[in-house]
Amino acid sequence: MLLIAGTLRIPAENIDAVRAAAQAMIAETRKEDGCITYAFAQDLLDPGLIHISETWRDGAALKAHGESAHMAAWRAAAGGLGLGERDLKLYRAVEGQPI
């Protein structure tokens, strides 16, 4: 299992446009084979900061996600929205358990 966690910086004035562009991509991503979780969340104290959390079954599923049409559409739309610093980390997990 692969976990991705991190942040994406967005100009606060573009948050509505980013939200609109991201919604279709997120909805399609959640339907992908191998996608366990996929979420963007706006920071409550810093409106220009988006927290990203992803869980994938394996590397093949993550690779297919990166090559998908909806990710290409997201990258094209996001290019004009002033997306700033991206800080994402990939983690490998053996198993998870409720806490």
Regions found by a protein language model. Give the residues of each.
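Short, well-ordered beta-strand segments in beta-rich or mixed alpha/beta enzyme
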Residues: 2-9, 39-66
